[in-house]
Amino acid sequence: GVKFFLWTSQWGRFTNTGPIKGKGDLFYFVHTTLWAFLPWSFAGFFALFKKTKEIIKRKSTGETYSYFGFITLFLIFSFSKFQLSFYLNPLFPLLAIITTATLLDARIKTLKIFSVIHMVVCCFLAVGLLALNYFFLNTLPYIDTIIIILAGFTAGFYLFSKRGIYLKKILFATAMVCLSVNYYVNRDFYPALMHYQAESEVAYYMKTNNIPADKIVFVGPIQSVADIILHHVTTVVDNDTVEKADVSDKYVFTSPEGRNKLDSLGMKYSIIKTFEDFPVTRLTGKFINRKTRSAEVEPKYLMKVNPADFRIPVVDVTTR
């Protein structure tokens, strides 16, 4: 109840005494910030370094609330034993304020250096986008995506080609390129990627084909996201503890291990559909490469299990 939300779940994550445990890495949020705040992460780290140096030497001007707010929470998160990348989300506005203030007061030489850095980063983003589309999809993006990318990259690199206007290059040109890349990622890449999250795919399949949510049983170590899609708390049974009564005359979603368990119980079933599954939050190069992807995905099955025969066998003890 209240204690769990205000104490166990929060302080327990920091001390690693709660229900959710982790190992903790002191530098986890350092390298997470490097990619999560990209392409302004280099300017962000420079701004933090410069502000820290000014405060130590007591030469700081302007407000310091953003700086100390960021540093305090960043250190708390870094010392926590349980860490997730999205913990940084509330810190990004503070880091953006610090970074912008530093760039506005920076010398021309500094701005010139960062404008070059951002142009290089944008070039890498462009190459990365092309590589991602080629290896993962190998199809043309949607027409609206193509228009957005062409417009964003053209405007961005046009600004980069202009002499001077270093601050506009760092802020606006970079933003145009990044918005274009993010449009592609959310319009084309993520929708295709989510087809490999079998738990959500089976839920959409059930809704489309009018399969009752209360008739599905998830067998195996599955952290089902289907509950949200189906608006129903689904039943999850472990492979080692599943019994005939759990799956008799039910729809079952399971892995090859769960299928083998049903075979050992003597259950009869028909496979309705096979899904390809992969932990989509932990991407690998072999999975992204469509030529090696088949070896990385695991099949998951939606099956209709026949009613089990619970009759006790009659033993003929008649002596002849």
Where is each model-derived feature located?
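Membrane-lumen/periplasm interface segments of specific transmembrane helices
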Residues: 1-4, 79
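Terminal, non-globular segments
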Residues: 45-49
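Residue-level signature of the transmembrane alpha-helical core
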Residues: 10, 33-34, 71
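Membrane-interface anchor segments at the N-terminal boundary of transmembrane helices
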Residues: 21-42, 85, 137-143
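Juxtamembrane membrane-water interface segments that cap and precede transmembrane helices
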Residues: 6-29
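Membrane-embedded architecture of ER/inner-membrane glycosylation machinery
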Residues: 50-320
